[in-house]
Design a protein with these regions (language model features):
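TPR/TPR-like (Sel1-like) alpha-helical repeat modules
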Residues: 171-175
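Short sequence/structural elements of tandem HEAT/ARM alpha-solenoid repeats
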Residues: 102-106, 133-138, 162-170, 200-201
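Structural detector for internal amphipathic alpha-helices that build alpha-solenoid repeat scaffolds
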Residues: 10-16, 23-34, 42-65, 75-79, ...
Length: 201
């Protein structure tokens, strides 16, 4: 599908620009540079020593670390946790893919919580199974536009060039149906990532 890559021209991104601030942009940055959060974890104690205060996430992190039952870990994925606790949780569920992935997929189809969708997005980007085909096949069953936008982002990291027309279509849908929102940024950032992944020197 190399011809699909030719659709992603400079003119296309001028007409559908990447915005400086959006939920998808934040999530994309975290997926692309997860080490940023690790650096933040190292810097926070220094800032605390200088008198700055931050929410204490140690209890949430400890609760995730001591939990070993998959069903309870999955319930935690539905909660809003501090960023560090979320990262610990993701590392615990990734090796349990056979049990966890079907439940993640069920959550995506049923859940409306933004934090749950964000956790599921991070999981799908990093799990061994490439769920691109599943996302496209089940896309119309996902009712929440925010969830759809985030799943488009997953396609940017995991799908092939054959996903480009689908993502371009979603950009048009979001821009038409939700002109005052930034849902279009999910598929736009996905297209940008696909262009980077498959560009030829």
């Amino acid at each position: 599908m190399p011809d699909n890559l030719k659709l992603l021209t400079k003119d296309y991104f001028n007409r559908h620009p990447i915005k400086d601030i959006s939920a998808a942009r934040f999530e994309y940055s975290m997926l692309l540079h997860p080490e940023v959060m690790d650096i933040a974890d190292e810097v926070i104690p220094e800032l605390q020593a200088k008198g700055l205060s931050f929410p204490d996430d140690s209890a949430a992190v400890a609760a995730v670390e001591k939990e070993d039952e998959t069903a309870r870990l999955l319930r935690m994925l539905r909660k809003t946790l501090p960023p560090k606790a979320n990262r610990v949780l993701l590392e615990k569920v990734l090796p349990r893919e056979e049990e966890v992935l079907p439940e993640i997929q069920r959550m995506i189809l049923k859940e409306f919580s933004d934090s749950t969708i964000e956790n599921c997005t991070r999981y799908l980007v990093r799990c061994r199974t490439n769920c691109s085909e599943w996302i496209i096949q089940n896309y119309n069953s996902i009712r929440e536009p925010y969830a759809r936008s985030m799943l488009c982002l997953v396609l940017g990291f995991r799908a092939g060039l054959d996903a480009i027309p689908f993502l371009m279509q979603q950009v048009e849908v979001f821009e038409t149906c939700f002109p005052s929102e930034t849902f279009d940024q999910g598929p736009i950032l996905a297209l940008s990532e696909l262009k980077v992944r498959f560009r030829t020197v």
